[in-house]
Amino acid sequence: IQEDHLGLNDIHDLNDLARVKSVIVKSVKKDGWAVLNAEDKHCVEIAKELNCNIAYFSMNEHCDVIVNHCRKGGIAAIYENGFITIKKGDWKMRVEKATHIPLTLGGKAKFMIANVLAATLASYLWGFKTEDIKAPLETFIPSAAQTPGRMNIFNFKNFKVMIDFAHNPAGYLGIEDFLQSVDATNKIGIIAGVGDRRDSDIIECAAIAARMFNHIVIRQEKHLRGRTEEEIIGLIM
């Protein structure tokens, strides 16, 4: 649960956003499962209000929530020694190496690894066998065909183009972390602001962009979501 959509429809802070998102897991049947991020304090608090089974995922296998949960026999998905791993109590089952999963872009896109952990855990809880989980992980490609606008990378002779619809600070930070692992002479960003986000969010996205790119081109979309182009560009600048 990260800062996005704040300032919209009476959602003013992360506590408000957490209450809205909790509606989904609070609707799960008693014999069903809620898959929650063990590293997010809001998710951990939400877990206390649920009447269903709970499973956690984390990039850190030593996370206190994971350790305590599994000590009680709970089920979790962890990123362990480069592997997507299911953990139940003291028992571990490695599902796949992250570098073998295209969505992780060679294991460099950490936020994608976290997404894979959640999806793998949900699949395991649903009853899928390990091989039936591995197959789609190995064949689901971040591309215009399968994930349009999400980490789409196009290879040209002397350069690469990556397209991603990151539009909040958390998304920009994820891209920044990934780009730090990319060896490139120049990193040129074409960015835009999202008009229905708070001033502070647009300004923070611009600051992150300034850190991760050598050159920046500002290009606004036609749908400005309630602001003028000049206003958005002013906040970015």
Regions found by a protein language model. Give the residues of each.
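Short internal beta-strands
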Residues: 34-38, 188-191, 214-221
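Flexible active-site lid/hinge loop adjacent to a nucleotide/diphosphate
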Residues: 1-56, 61-63, 169
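P-loop/Walker A phosphate-binding loop and immediately adjacent motor/lid segment at beta-alpha junctions
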Residues: 23-32, 52-53, 176-183, 189, ...
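Cofactor-binding loop segments of dinucleotide-utilizing enzymes, especially the Rossmann-like FAD-
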Residues: 1, 59, 192-194, 221
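Acidic-glycine-rich active-site phosphate/pyrophosphate-binding loop
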Residues: 75-101
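Beta-strand->loop->alpha-helix junctions that form or flank phosphate-binding loops
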Residues: 51-80, 136-140, 152
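Nucleotide phosphate-binding/pyrophosphate-handling subdomain across enzymes
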Residues: 94-215
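C-terminal helical cap/extension that packs against the catalytic core
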Residues: 205-237
